[in-house]
Amino acid sequence: MKILILCDMFPPAFGPRMGYLCKYMRRAGWEPVVVTEQIDDSTFSFLKGETPVTYVNFFHSKGKILQKLEWICVFILDYFFHYKDKKMAKAASRLLEEGEYAGILCSSYRTFPLPAAQYIAEKYHLPLVIDLRDIVEQYASNEYIAHNFRTFSWLDRKITEIFRHKLLRDRNNALRKAEQVTTISPWHVEKLQAYNPNTELVYNGYDPELFYPEQHRTSQFVITYTGRLISLATRDPRLLFEAVSRLDREKLIDPDQFRIQWYVDAGSKAIIMQAATAYPVARYMDF
């Protein structure tokens, strides 16, 4: 049986949750088919596998100025006319017209492409399952917005307030129409059950083929971080850098015996490197 998956990102981009889900679905006899946004990233290229994927590209410009102008245009069109969701729904509809599907799964860290999934589920009378990896309410500030508006501070706050309201309204409308909702922690479950009581917990995990319990002695002490850093508001590595700096200053560690390994995307790396500039820790880090 085929399952159509709509998601905001999918391998080779930074989308391990859906990437691994597709891997296990195929083993269980399901046929996942994915529609996702085209993102220039190859962090999880090894996870794409044999899953058929339709990539929808919203951004075509080259050069920083044109890219910024294009982003503003897409943002305005999407805010007023659901541009991205309509384009995603159109790509998904073409696939649904070609064969039978048992249902639709939509995974998002914010809201997009939930309205698209809600629309095609209603149009084709298919059950909808929504998976939310992150939600707007968990962020300390406006880290869920990919780009700063960079206008006047008071205007930025107003735009952010209006944008947040729209994100939550669209998300909650889709949640109410879903047959099932899954999310990543008990706190998320509690928040989302207010909009859909059929909300269940599915933790993020590790592929047992790559990570499994093992005991062995090594020549290095390694601290490993896997994931993304959107800002320093909720995940601040400077406390770690301060501790490492102190241990280095007291000559209790050296780079041959102590390493910090980061498995992150390019945006996260830039945040980490910027935060590390005030500390003598670069020689301890690997990316």
Language model segments and positions:
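Nucleotide-activated donor-binding/catalytic signature segment of Leloir-type glycosyltransferases, i.e.
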Residues: 252-264, 269-287
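Acidic anion/phosphate-binding donor-loop and adjacent secondary structure
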Residues: 193, 206-220
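Membrane-proximal helix-turn-helix segments that form the acceptor-binding/catalytic region
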Residues: 86, 90, 119-123, 136-138, ...
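Carbohydrate-associated surface elements
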Residues: 184-187, 205
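Conserved nucleotide-sugar donor-binding subdomain of glycosyltransferases
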Residues: 67-113, 157-168
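An aromatic- and histidine-rich active-site surface loop
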Residues: 81-88, 104-124, 130-146
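Conserved donor-binding/catalytic core segment of Leloir-type glycosyltransferases
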Residues: 215-237, 241-244
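N-terminal subdomain of nucleotide-sugar transferases
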Residues: 1-58, 180, 247
